[in-house]
Amino acid sequence: MALNGQLCRFCAIFSRGSSTTIPWAVYALAMNTNPPAVLVTGSGRGLGKGVALELARSGMSVAIHYGANDAAAQATAEECAEMAPNPAQLFPLLKADLYEASGRDGLIDQALLVLGRLDALVNNAGITSPGRADVLENTEAAWDEVMDVNLKAPWFISQKAARWWVEHPGESRLEGGFKLVFVSSVSAEMASMNRGDYCISKAGIGMMARVFALRLAAHGTQVVEFRPGIMETDMTAGVKEKYDPIINGGKVPMRRWGQPSDVGRAVRSFLKGDLPFCTGEAIYLDGGLHLPLL
């Protein structure tokens, strides 16, 4: 795995804006590597990291996008390299601010540059409602912030990936063709009065998955939306005491926290071709949280 480590370190430097050009040998390897290539947004930590690790374990190259935490992203890349079964797998780090058009617009180009191709896109990056204000107190600034990251970014990133796929018919290294994944939330269906903007953004992701599914089906691309429930990550550590009794009390019928690996394994299964006749669907990963109970 020494080669993987060298590539990770190189790509980390490249992603931080180094003017160093990519050595021809490294670029040639990226262009001719056998593993499928996947971009996972927001994969330096949390659910996205869980996805990246599962894909790495299954033999895929993964471009690890992140916004700010260099150390966490580097650690994720190193963990991916350690568990990768194929020495040809690559785990470049791509740093981009999804709040900004420049960050969104260049992400697919960066992924294609360092991976040489793109067989799947996993839209995972997202933010919660700033301040978690009540519906009657939500500000326009907070609304715009949530929509920019949770809706505008995946829309235009997916659009750019889809254009590349349409231009490269039949070239996917994944069984069943290219794949587009949206990691959403049960909040697409379940309302929270202090996170109204967030819930609306996740509901919008559901329709986004449907329209891309309809547009790309004839081009050999499958689309799916995964809706995680209450997940145990570093970002939910501060509310663990609040949710433990809720989960144990049966609000989540399976009575446990969801794990990043639960999302990662679902994404891996879809990318590996285990759902060959599925597109445009919303699949819940919530232990039954969304199910109505009389």
Question: In which residue ranges do the predicted regions lie?
Answer:
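Residue(s) in the substrate-gating loop at a strand-loop-helix junction
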Residues: 185
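Short C-terminal tail/terminal secondary-structure segment
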Residues: 132, 250, 268, 279-294
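Alpha-helical segment proximal to the catalytic Tyr-Lys
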Residues: 163, 214-215, 276
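Substrate-binding pocket helix/loop in short-chain dehydrogenase/reductase
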Residues: 132-135, 139-147, 248
